[in-house]
């Protein structure tokens, strides 16, 4: 759990006294304890000289109404306070950096988001004046999205002249050359295939590529929202939500 991670990284911490559901780890053999200590040290080294509460990530892969995430909020809040963060800064940091949730039901995701916002607002009455960006999502299915049409509309290789994707009769002017050799095409192809039945498989879906590849593609596509033509912008708006959930599923978390 995230609480156990914190205590192993900070053995002298007293925050566990505030955690109602904290369970003291069972005593381990010397060999196992060495392995655990090595893992904890590796995780601490990722942040520098000590574990940074802003880097701790918690995912509820079937978040429902958000009960577990709300409990995690209290746990994380104690960590931030112990490190001397200002109370008014903590709610936004937790919601935007620490907590992640997925569900197959959009109503459940809405309830979880609402529960977290209300929990955070107890600590910062001004929070909703500039609402934080939550990492809670209801998984979307790809539906009838057509890979070839999306790729042609995106025109990432500028194989067609801008504004001439189609002729007056709607037939495609020309096909992009060898899209199968483009890593971006392969990523989009994977995303569309993985999420074809997302409402059935939910967070059991395992992404094939590292998180960074989906993030890089998302950033590249988002640039087209400012510079692209009408077809490019429409294609980006269809793909970005799918890439966001791909990023959440590909991401490595401290606690799940």
Task: Locate the predicted segments by residue.
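SAM-dependent methyltransferase catalytic region
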Residues: 1-255
């Amino acid at each position: 759990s995230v609480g156990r991670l914190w205590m192993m990284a900070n053995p002298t911490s007293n925050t566990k006294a505030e955690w109602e559901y904290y369970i003291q780890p069972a005593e381990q053999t010397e060999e196992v304890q060495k392995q655990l200590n090595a893992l904890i040290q590796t995780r601490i080294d990722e942040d520098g000289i000590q574990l940074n509460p802003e880097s701790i990530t918690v995912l509820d892969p079937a978040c429902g109404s958000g009960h577990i995430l709300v409990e995690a909020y209290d746990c994380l809040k104690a960590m931030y306070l112990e490190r001397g963060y200002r109370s008014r800064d903590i709610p936004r940091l937790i919601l935007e950096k620490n907590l992640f949730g997925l569900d197959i039901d959009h109503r459940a995701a809405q309830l979880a988001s609402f529960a977290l916002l209300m929990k955070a607002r107890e600590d910062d009455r001004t929070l909703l004046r500039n609402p934080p960006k939550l990492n809670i999502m209801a998984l979307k299915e790809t539906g009838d999205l057509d890979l070839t049409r999306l790729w042609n509309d995106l025109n990432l290789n500028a194989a067609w002249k801008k504004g001439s994707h189609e002729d007056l009769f709607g037939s495609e002017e020309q096909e992009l050359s060898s899209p199968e050799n483009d890593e971006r095409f392969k990523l989009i192809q994977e995303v569309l295939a993985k999420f074809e039945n997302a409402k059935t498989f939910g967070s059991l879906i395992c992404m094939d590529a590292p998180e960074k590849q989906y993030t890089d593609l998302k950033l590249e596509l988002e640039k087209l929202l400012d510079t692209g033509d009408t077809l490019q912008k429409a294609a980006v708006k269809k793909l970005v939500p799918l890439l966001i959930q791909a990023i959440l599923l590909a991401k490595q978390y401290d606690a799940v």
